A protein has these predicted regions:
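Extracellular/periplasmic carbohydrate-active domains that bind, remodel
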Residues: 1-184
Length: 184
């Protein structure tokens, strides 16, 4: 259990995973995250090394500013990522919400509830390479079972909205994942 914690880093601010074994029963609340690559990262391996299962994780009451990505879920080696709940999360971010599983049936039970992600200016020129790295859609998800978005809002002004190919690209997922996208 982690609570009432400010974090700042140039890498992922809160990373769950990377290594061997199983990580389970993580509880984190009332976090303030500043200036990192990802606000929250769930990662089963790093560049093909390691294999960690991630299960039963809950984040609540999180604020993040200046992060590239509010949430990244990356499964690349067949390990399981299950039963992750993120609720009451507010982020000012430059990149997309990215949740991608390389293998079908390894990532399941992902819930984002009462989350607001506001897109802010990036310090990088929007070249094709930068667009591919940061994501071409505001929300990207693939190969996730039981993906649930409840009151998820992604806010973007008209000028920034032109820098994206679209609001959402969700492929090979099951669940309830409608969300509100707004131009402000």
């Amino acid at each position: 259990t982690i609570t009432n914690c400010p974090l700042a880093s140039s890498a992922c601010l809160f990373r769950v995973g990377v290594g061997q074994g199983t990580i389970r029963h993580v509880r984190a609340s009332n976090l303030t995250l500043e200036r990192g690559e990802a606000g929250m990262c769930f990662q089963t391996d790093f560049d093909g090394h390691g294999r960690v299962n991630i299960e039963d994780v809950n984040f609540s009451g999180v604020s993040a500013y200046g992060v590239s990505y509010p949430v990244i879920i990356w499964e690349g080696n067949g390990a399981n990522v299950r039963d992750i709940t993120i609720e009451n999360y507010r982020a000012w971010c430059m990149g997309s919400l990215r949740m991608n599983a390389a293998h079908r049936d390894t990532v399941s039970g992902i819930t984002l509830r009462n989350c607001d992600f506001r897109i802010i200016d990036s310090p990088f020129e929007m070249t094709e390479n930068v667009k591919n790295m940061r994501g071409r859609y505001l929300c990207e998800a693939s190969n996730i079972n039981e993906l649930i978005f409840e009151n998820l809002r992604i806010l973007c002004d008209e000028e920034r909205a032109k820098l994206w190919d679209g609001g959402a690209r969700i492929m090979n997922c099951t669940g309830k994942y409608g969300f509100e996208g707004e131009t402000i």
